[in-house]
Swiss-Prot record:
Keyword Transferase: no
Deletion consequences: Smaller size at birth and laterality defects with half exhibiting situs inversus and 15% showing heterotaxy. One study showed that mutants develop hydrocephalus around 3~4 weeks after birth and die by 6 weeks. Another study showed that 72% of mutants that survive after birth die within 6 weeks while 25% live longer than 8 weeks of age. 9+0 cilia of the embryonic node are completely immotile and are shorter than normal while 9+2 cilia within the trachea and brain ventricles differentiate normally and retain motility but have an abnormal beating pattern.
Function: Microtubule inner protein (MIP) part of the dynein-decorated doublet microtubules (DMTs) in cilia axoneme, which is required for motile cilia beating. Regulates motility patterns of both 9+0 and 9+2 motile cilia through differential localization and recruitment of axonemal dynein components. Required for centriolar satellite integrity and non-motile cilium assembly. Required for motile cilium formation. Through its role in the beating of primary cilia, involved in the establishment of organ laterality during embryogenesis.
InterPro entries: CFAP53/TCHP (IPR043596), TPH_dom (IPR043597)
Protein name as it appears in the record: Cilia- and flagella-associated protein 53
Lineage start: Eukaryota, Metazoa, Chordata, Craniata, Vertebrata
Coiled coil: 91-176, 205-478
Gene Ontology annotations for the cellular component aspect, listed alphabetically: 9+0 motile cilium; 9+2 motile cilium; axonemal A tubule inner sheath; axonemal microtubule; axoneme; centriolar satellite; ciliary transition zone; extracellular region
Swiss-Prot/TrEMBL keywords: Cell projection, Cilium, Cilium biogenesis/degradation, Coiled coil, Cytoplasm, Cytoskeleton, Developmental protein, Differentiation, Flagellum, Spermatogenesis
Family of the protein in this entry: Belongs to the CFAP53 family.
GO biological process: cerebrospinal fluid circulation; cilium assembly; cilium movement; determination of left/right symmetry; epithelial cilium movement involved in determination of left/right asymmetry; establishment of localization in cell; flagellated sperm motility; manchette assembly
Amino acid sequence: MYSQQFGTVPREFKGPTPKAVIIRAKPPKAQRAEQHLKRIQRSYHKYHTTLASIKSNEENRLKCDWIQRNNHKTFDSLVQARVQDAMQGFVINTEERRNKLRELLASEENEYFSEMQLKGETIEEKKDKMRERTKLLREKKEKERQEFVAEKLDQQFRERCEELRTKLASIHEKKVVEERNAQIEFNKELKRQKLVEEHLFARLWEEDRLAKERREAQEEKRQRELVQNTRLGLDAQVTSIQAQRQGARRMKEEEARILEQNKAQIKREDEQEKLQKQKRRQETRSSLKKAVQDKIESMQREYREDLDLNMKLVGRALQDLQDEADKKKQKREEMGREQKIYNDYLMQRREEEKAQEKELNRLLEDIKAKKLAEKDRELALQRAARKQLMNEVMNTRKLQVQERLQRKLREQEELALHEQRISESLKVLHQEDMEDFARRCALAEEYRNQLQMQIAHQQQAREAEKEEERQEFEAGLAANKACLDKIQRILSENQALSQNVHPMRRGYPDKPPL
């Protein structure tokens, strides 16, 4: 498996010297049956684990669905109850408000009747008062309308009068120029104050810088003294630390010497132990060879009781190996039985699949035969329908030919009748033309008379138009005079408004608006 993944793996590895070589141990041989059994067991375990997981997930899903369904039912019932309570409360509140409104209207009506009774007014007096009030309201409304119309006319005059707009623009321009000059002066004053403030800040900054330099010099001096004192303390500490280090170095050298001695002692002990192990291994190997030879010579002979402890241990180890071999053999037999059961199961599944496939083929053949029969029936029905349609088309064609012949005969009869009507119409038209000529002559005479009357009327209209133009000219002169008067009045009002200074300007006369 390793060689399949990573290619051929060399067994020899070179050491630090030219002739030093390390050989990798051979990998153990793969046990196919055990690996196959383990794969089957893993797949079986995985299958059952998946089934258990699916079952638990299904149970959890059903449980969650049941919980959600119960929660939805509980929530729906709670919402329904709250909605019913709210609707019932709304209905109760509506009824209460209606009752209160009825009581209030009844009390107001009673108060109104009692007040009417106390005043002793009659219906006629009340009607007179209502008429007077209506008249006052109408007059007030008419007055407001006239004021509104006058205001709009004045506004329209202000918007359309070019001379007024020119004068107002010149006045506004002069005012803007004055305010701009004042603003420029104010900005110059601000710049001058800003320069003064900058000089003051520069002086304060210089003083602060000098004070900071003095503080830094004092701090530097204090730091130098502190560093000097710290250096002296550190020198003393370094001296003591060096002495401690020398003592520690001597102790380490002593410990290293003792450690070397211990290592040499341990090395000697290891060599002795290695020799003893080799001796014991040789003894064990010889005893094992002897035991194997005895076992080969007589398998049924009882073990001798006078063997030493090492032989007993070897026999016990061999017995364990034999038990393990028996267990492996039994395990292989069980695996063989399981493999046989699995193969039987696979054969049964294949036979069942073949039977299902045969049944499916049979069903497909039946469905195919049914479809072919249905298709044959449909084709027979289509042929019958096509034949019937052809017969209907031929009959319809015959009827159309007959109708066309009849229509042609009717058209010939209608054409003869139409020619007869045309001749009669020509006679009637000639008679109407004669009557029309006589009527036109009468209309021409009447038109001539009306034209003469129209000329006389136009002369009168021109004279009236001249009179109207003269009156309009006089009215225009009067309107021009009124317009000039109005312009003067508006300019005087504008000057009066310009003299009314805003409270902020009165409070700060030296600061023009920005």
